[in-house]
Amino acid sequence: MAPIDWKKWRHVTKLDPDKKITRQDIAAIVDSGTDAVMISGTQNITKENVGNMIDMLAEYSIPKVLEPSVSAIIRNDVDFIFVPSIFNTKYSKFAVGYHKDFVKNYPDEVLDKVIPEAYIVLNPLSAVAIVTRAQTGISPREAAAYAELADRFFRFPVVYIEYSGTYGNPELVKAVREKLTNTVLYYGGGIDSREKAETMAKYANTIVVGNAVYKKGGIEKLKETIVK
């Protein structure tokens, strides 16, 4: 089997293990044209509900990504493990602290699947912002500086602009993209229409769609957001 080139993904569907979804919906998501499925959440994430989600996806060949909020849920039966480091927080445990324990406690076969993400969290009302005490009120220039730091200094393969449920500022995303040379830019937050998807896809290499899946008519909304 050829290696999976995650850098070429244009659209990723994010599924929250704490939210209900049917096997029929899973099949429709896989068939939608999305490039990969990311299993990710902040609240009430357990080994059990992560395992249930992975089991529902097991029969499909679509690339599977686990984005853990805690190291206890990490599993090896996925293609990649995208590990966030929160850049816009004063609390180092969310940037390197928990990650040190992860590296210390997991074998190479797991660590080899890790793709580090430089996270810039921008929705102050989101669970991830509250938990990490992210400094969300930053300007496009400051966000771009964080992104350039991730790219030039720390060589992160991914910068992730996270608006988490609300639609963000395209000018901020554009400013970030202009500072990246080698790093892939992910954008997630509030994409629930073709127009919003196309706007953010002009600047982000990859857009991530999550909450739209769980709204009324969610699968059809998801299909509207597929860009290539």
Curated annotation (Swiss-Prot):
GO MF terms held by the record: magnesium ion binding; phosphoglycerol geranylgeranyltransferase activity
Subcellular compartments: Cytoplasm
Primary residence: cytoplasm
Positions that bind sn-glycerol 1-phosphate: 14, 160-165, 190, 210-211
EC number: 2.5.1.41
Superkingdom field: Archaea
DNA damage found in the keyword field: no
Transmembrane segments: none
Cofactors required: Mg(2+)
A cellular-component GO term for this protein: cytoplasm
A biological process term (GO) from this entry: glycerophospholipid biosynthetic process
Pathway info: Membrane lipid metabolism; glycerophospholipid metabolism
InterPro entries the record matches: GGGP/HepGP_synthase_I, GGGP/HepGP_synthase_sf, GGGP_HepGP_synthase, GGGP_synthase_archaea
Keywords: Cytoplasm, Lipid biosynthesis, Lipid metabolism, Magnesium, Metal-binding, Phospholipid biosynthesis, Phospholipid metabolism, Transferase
Reaction it catalyzes: sn-glycerol 1-phosphate + (2E,6E,10E)-geranylgeranyl diphosphate = sn-3-O-(geranylgeranyl)glycerol 1-phosphate + diphosphate
Record Gene3D superfamilies: FMN-linked oxidoreductases
Principal EC category: transferase
Residues that, per the record, bind Mg(2+): 16, 42
Role: Prenyltransferase that catalyzes the transfer of the geranylgeranyl moiety of geranylgeranyl diphosphate (GGPP) to the C3 hydroxyl of sn-glycerol-1-phosphate (G1P). This reaction is the first ether-bond-formation step in the biosynthesis of archaeal membrane lipids.
Family statement drawn from the similarity comment of this UniProt entry: Belongs to the GGGP/HepGP synthase family. Group I subfamily.
Designated name of the protein: Geranylgeranylglyceryl phosphate synthase
